[in-house]
Regions:
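Glycine-rich/acidic phosphate-handling loop/turn and adjacent ATP-lid/helix
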Residues: 89-158
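Flexible, glycine-/charge-rich segments associated with ATP-binding catalytic modules
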Residues: 2-44, 129-132, 139-141, 145, ...
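Bergerat-fold GHKL ATPase/HATPase_c domain
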Residues: 8-76, 80-110, 121-123
């Protein structure tokens, strides 16, 4: 092994390890900075953006791991069921056919849906942290989804709101 190459590789490895350590320390510092946020507002359109934002926004809450899945479910629902108007039965069929993602992509390009966005506002108040998720859809009968309905237990979806209500948040309202 050429000593010059080995030395170069080792120097690079040490430099990268130091950089990673520094970045991780900064990340920890920034995690604490989320407690300084009073209000923040986000707009997004896609499922990927919903997932990314959920992971980011979860850090605004005292227990990010607890709220992450609930935020993601509600944000994804806002895109697919709200803005893109994919109903429960339609989603069931799309999932059964393996065409759910393709249908999401198709609708995202349609004139009536392409300019729609979801807005998320997170606000810190004395009595808690609030996330308001608003889409531009037609609305739906949310009450039937707040708990897991045994008649839907075998369905391939339809538990996200109930799970968010039961496990992710102290209170979930529409």
């Amino acid at each position: 092994v050429d000593e010059k190459i080995l030395r170069s590789v080792l120097i690079a490895a040490v430099r990268e390890a130091h950089q990673n350590r520094t970045l991780n320390e900064e990340l920890k510092k920034h995690k604490a900075s989320f407690n300084l946020i009073q209000t923040c507002k986000f707009h997004f359109q896609t499922l990927e953006e919903a997932e990314c934002l959920a992971a980011f926004a979860a850090h605004c809450f005292p227990d990010p791991e607890r709220v992450l899945q609930g935020l993601a479910e509600l944000m994804i629902n806002a895109v697919e069921h709200g803005n893109l108007e994919i109903g429960y039965e339609r989603k069931t069929n799309l999932l059964n056919d393996g065409t759910w993602r393709a249908e999401i992509q198709r609708r995202m390009l349609m004139d009536e849906y392409q300019d729609r966005f979801v807005e998320v506002v997170i606000t810190r108040k004395d009595n808690g942290i609030y996330a308001i998720i608003s889409d531009q859809g037609l609305g739906f009968n949310w009450k039937r989804y707040m708990t897991i309905d045994p008649s839907r237990a075998g369905d391939n979806h339809g538990r996200g709101i109930a799970q968010a209500n039961a496990m992710s948040f102290d209170k979930l309202t529409y």
